[in-house]
């Protein structure tokens, strides 16, 4: 059973917290993480790329010259793909890149991502972050005290003071337990769980 230290925003130890082993001590399988990350990234693709075919391109309605008698190769349109300025053959058309991943697999991948951060000792539990006012410098001070670089901070709810103070800091991303994703966990080198967010994360994945 994983027992982690709980720190305050000045990185002073305030206690300990036991994490659910079925969420934070799962064997990591890279192929599962890879599958889910690919699915999440594919789902974000717009897929709006489109080229004009010979049926949609402008012009090319009239036959360039008569079929027989000129000595030239027969041609029906100056927008044929073999002509300069002609249409494109088999070019990209709008499509949906998303593919289905079973709910059990998605949940398992999230557990694996959390487990990998704990195993690497890149998971920190912080009692809470209290800022006196909306100022980036206050959040920079907290991030410096906690030793945060590229970090994902999971907060129980989106506190405006915290969100507005952190949004201009490169590398710091805020999320709620409901928004947590495998891609975001793996994208950030550090994972910071506010103490109030630990139980909702565990409840979501049990």
From Swiss-Prot:
Domain of life assignment: Bacteria
MF (Gene Ontology):
rRNA binding; structural constituent of ribosome
GO:BP terms for this protein? translation
Give the UniProt keywords, A-Z: Ribonucleoprotein, Ribosomal protein, RNA-binding, rRNA-binding
Family matches, as Pfam families: Ribosomal_L4 (PF00573)
The record's annotation in InterPro entries points to:
Ribosomal_uL4 (IPR002136), Ribosomal_uL4-like (IPR013005), Ribosomal_uL4_dom_sf (IPR023574)
Q: For the region Disordered, give the residue spans.
A: 44-80
Cellular component (GO) terms are: ribonucleoprotein complex; ribosome
Family as reported in the entry's similarity comment: Belongs to the universal ribosomal protein uL4 family.
Per its database record, what is this protein's job?
Answer: One of the primary rRNA binding proteins, this protein initially binds near the 5'-end of the 23S rRNA. It is important during the early stages of 50S assembly. It makes multiple contacts with different domains of the 23S rRNA in the assembled 50S subunit and ribosome.
Q: Which PANTHER family match?
A: 50S RIBOSOMAL PROTEIN L4 (PTHR10746), LARGE RIBOSOMAL SUBUNIT PROTEIN UL4M (PTHR10746:SF6)
Question: Oligomeric state and partners?
Answer: Part of the 50S ribosomal subunit.
Q: What is this protein called?
A: Large ribosomal subunit protein uL4
Please give the organism: Oleidesulfovibrio alaskensis (strain ATCC BAA-1058 / DSM 17464 / G20) (Desulfovibrio alaskensis)
């Amino acid at each position: 059973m994983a027992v982690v230290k709980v720190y305050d925003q000045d990185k002073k130890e305030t206690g300990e917290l036991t994490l659910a082993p079925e969420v934070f001590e799962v064997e990591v399988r890279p192929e599962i993480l890879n599958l889910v990350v690919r699915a999440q990234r594919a789902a974000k693709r717009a897929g709006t790329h489109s080229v004009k075919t010979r049926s949609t391109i402008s012009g090319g309605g009239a036959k360039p010259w008569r079929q027989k008698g000129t000595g030239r190769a027969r041609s029906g349109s100056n927008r044929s793909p073999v002509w300069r300025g002609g249409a494109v053959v088999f070019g990209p058309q709008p499509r949906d890149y998303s593919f289905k991943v079973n709910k059990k697999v998605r949940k398992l991948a999230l557990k694996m991502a959390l487990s990998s951060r704990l195993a690497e000792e890149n998971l920190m539990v912080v009692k809470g972050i209290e800022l006196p006012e909306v100022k980036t410098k206050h959040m920079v001070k907290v991030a410096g005290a906690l030793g945060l670089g590229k970090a994902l901070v999971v907060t129980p709810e989106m506190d405006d003071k915290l969100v507005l103070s952190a949004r201009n800091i490169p590398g710091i991303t805020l999320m709620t337990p409901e928004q947590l994703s495998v891609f975001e966990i793996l994208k950030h080198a550090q994972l910071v769980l506010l103490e109030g967010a630990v139980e909702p994360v565990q409840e979501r994945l049990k």
